[in-house]
Amino acid sequence: MLFKIKVFCSSVLLSLCALLSTAQQIDYPSTDQVAADFKKLLERPHVPLNPSFEVTKTDSVIIEHGFIYSEKNERVPILIYKPTTGARTYPAVIFLHGTGGKKEDNKKILYQLVKRGIMGVSIDARFHGERIAGGAHGSKEYVAAATAAWENKDKARQTHPFLFDTAFDLWRVTDYLVSRSDVAPNRLGMGGISMGGIETWLAASADQRIKVIVLDISVQSFKWSLDNNKWQGRVGTIQGAHLQAAKDLGDSTLNKRNIKAVWDKLLPHITDEFDCPSLLRLMAPRALLVVGTENDPNCPLPGANIAYASAMQAYISKNATNKISRDIAPKLFHTSTPEHFKMTLDWFSKWL
């Protein structure tokens, strides 16, 4: 098993052999078509951002806490850490929390980014943190929203609270950042852990403004997990919605059929055109770091290998293998490691 893969020009052929041999053969649409299709799926009426922030200044960091609007009635809470060096513009990184978390969970990495001269930005995902009046109760409201989206019968009002809607919010957050006079619009990065990493590969794939990407315990293949009975970890993140779907479909247990039914409704085409092996192709030739763990049940390694192999093929075709790297921590389950935390910071520093 391949535990550590660091791909640079001198070692690309050796590292690819094991990966490419496992790749599932799917004839995805072109990258341009996939990007256009994903944007069309998530498009919604354009509204003014109407940003509003409170600013707190300390000796080491300027903290901005506020919000923008991504939709008419959808306020996106944002936390920004800005360096105090007085530079005219800064590179900026959006970093995203995992399931049941909140933007404040990322204070440590935001502060470390500031120490490296980078503006750090974090948001609350849909139905997390301040998106819920009084604060969300872990993932309770998120799972309830996914369940409601499953039970919705009005196609014109179908929502996608499971990952997709937050990806749209990230496009609007990027719109806001490039509108700021203190942000260098050609020096933007995005990353996240677990759910936040998935939201990153969804949003960044179709948004070329994001130049540097880090994906932590989030790269996978939804199709591989479904086809190989390794869906349990991923399904567990919104298990209540899946259990309701199984009941609605007359099943006494979770199975491939009712799981796919939920994904087809809440995450259309996540097992084909918008699966990770397809969307990672869109990252090339931008700087991409993938980190994960060997025994992650949420992102099984064989599916992650397929996604990475697909990405590598795209980077090879664009002569950009020096801008993609991967590290897999052996023996660990679904967890982010201190080593990967440092790699994340180093990657953003190197390429921004």
Region locations from a protein language model:
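Mobile cap/lid helix-loop segments that gate and shape the active-site cleft of serine hydrolases
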Residues: V212-L279, P300, A304-Y308, I316-T321
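C-terminal catalytic histidine-bearing segment of alpha/beta-hydrolase fold enzymes
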Residues: A245, Y308-L352
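Bacterial Sec-dependent N-terminal signal peptides
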Residues: M1-I26
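N-terminal cap/lid segment of alpha/beta-hydrolase-fold proteins
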Residues: K40-R88
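Cap/lid segment of the alpha/beta-hydrolase catalytic domain
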Residues: R88, T99-F168, W224-N229
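Conserved strand-to-loop "acid loop" that flanks and positions the catalytic carboxylate
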Residues: A284-L301
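Alpha/beta-hydrolase fold nucleophile elbow
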Residues: D182-S194
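Short glycine-enriched nucleophile-adjacent loop
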Residues: G197-Q208
